[in-house]
């Protein structure tokens, strides 16, 4: 239960965020992810550990939440000392930092005293029976190795890693990361 992040974005995919959050809490789930700060505030009384996935950095972020960083611009604009997770693009090409941007990202997060709690990816089309999932998983393993080396270099505490969404969990024979994100799978 400590390894699960329940994803409640878009009103828990239309099923009711407060209802699903309450039920998840009853089962011992302690972590959740939502789309926006608005959604996070709706369930802040239920969960202490909330990751906001699609936030546009304003410099006015709340200390209550953890924010996903999807690009260098977000690192430059987010409020100093904010808790963050780095999104890593491993093949989805929609959001996340490219592995080639990690050196610069760490320079910024160290300079701005950002608290790196995690790093993650989202496996594109993990429900499709092709090699994409395996390629993306290897890309994430390379990114993890780079992140751990940069943490050592900059004296930053090792973050937790999470990569598997619901569909990827159905394909995985084992999960190598500290956490998984469970939302909805068909």
Predicted features and spans:
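Active-site loop ensemble at the mouth of alpha/beta enzyme cores that anchors a bound cofactor
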Residues: 170-186
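Active-site-proximal beta-alpha core segment in soluble small-molecule metabolic enzymes
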Residues: 2-162
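Phosphate-binding site of ATP-dependent enzymes
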Residues: 160, 165-167, 175
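Active-site glycine-centered loops adjacent to acidic/histidine catalytic or metal-binding residues
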Residues: 9, 165, 183
């Amino acid at each position: 239960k400590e390894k699960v992040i329940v994803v409640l974005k878009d009103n828990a995919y239309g099923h009711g965020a407060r209802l699903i959050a309450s039920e998840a809490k009853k089962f011992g789930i302690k972590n959740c992810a939502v789309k926006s700060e608005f959604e996070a505030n709706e369930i802040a009384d239920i969960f202490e550990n909330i990751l906001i996935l699609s936030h546009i950095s304003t410099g006015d972020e709340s200390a209550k939440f953890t924010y996903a960083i999807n690009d260098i611009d977000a690192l430059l604009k987010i409020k100093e000392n904010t808790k963050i997770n780095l999104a890593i693009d491993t093949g989805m090409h929609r959001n996340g930092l490219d592995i080639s941007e990690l050196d610069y990202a760490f320079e910024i997060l160290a300079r701005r005293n950002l608290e790196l709690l995690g790093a993650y990816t989202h496996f594109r089309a993990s429900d499709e029976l092709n090699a994409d999932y395996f390629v993306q998983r290897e890309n994430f393993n390379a990114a993890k190795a780079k992140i751990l080396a940069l943490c050592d270099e900059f004296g930053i505490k090792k973050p937790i890693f999470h990569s598997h969404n619901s569909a990827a969990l159905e394909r995985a024979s084992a999960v190598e990361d500290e956490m998984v994100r469970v939302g909805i799978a068909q």
